């Protein structure tokens, strides 16, 4: 019974999550847009900062990060200037 309640809560939160946020795809992972300098084994990204302007699409997101000398990434969890579990946004070069 507890499993069903936890599973239902998980599904409900996934459905309530954003369906695309500032150049990053929606869903449970990779929803936080960051501009990062270094990628370590696609697990952690270092020297990250949050975009200072709205980045509604990948082109603007990529150009904004490039102006800082960084790469655009969509992360699951930003921690102390690092991004964890990050991916390139769909369509980024």
Swiss-Prot record:
Keywords: Cell membrane, Disulfide bond, Membrane, Signal. It comes from the Eukaryota. Residues 1-16 form the signal peptide. Disulfide bonds join 24-74, 35-65, 36-48, 75-86. It is found in: Cell membrane. Its main location: membrane. Coiled coil: none annotated. InterPro entries: Cerato-ulmin_hydrophobin, Hydrophobin_sf. Interacts with maize ubiquilin 1-like (UBL) protein. Homotetramer. Further self-assembles to form highly ordered films at water-air interfaces through intermolecular interactions. Belongs to the cerato-ulmin hydrophobin family. Aerial growth, conidiation, and dispersal of filamentous fungi in the environment rely upon a capability of their secreting small amphipathic proteins called hydrophobins (HPBs) with low sequence identity. Class I can self-assemble into an outermost layer of rodlet bundles on aerial cell surfaces, conferring cellular hydrophobicity that supports fungal growth, development and dispersal; whereas Class II form highly ordered films at water-air interfaces through intermolecular interactions but contribute nothing to the rodlet structure. This is Class II hydrophobin 1. The lineage of its organism: Eukaryota, Fungi, Dikarya, Ascomycota, Pezizomycotina. The gene is hyd1.
């Amino acid at each position: 019974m507890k499993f069903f309640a936890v599973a239902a809560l998980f599904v409900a939160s996934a459905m309530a999550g954003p369906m695309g946020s500032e150049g990053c795809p929606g869903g449970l992972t990779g929803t936080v847009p960051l501009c990062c300098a270094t990628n370590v084994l696609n697990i952690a990204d270092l020297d990250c900062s949050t975009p200072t302007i709205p980045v509604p699409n990948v082109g603007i997101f990529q150009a904004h990060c490039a102006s800082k000398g960084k790469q655009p990434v969509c992360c699951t969890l930003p921690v102390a200037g690092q991004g964890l579990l990050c991916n390139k946004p769909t369509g980024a070069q």
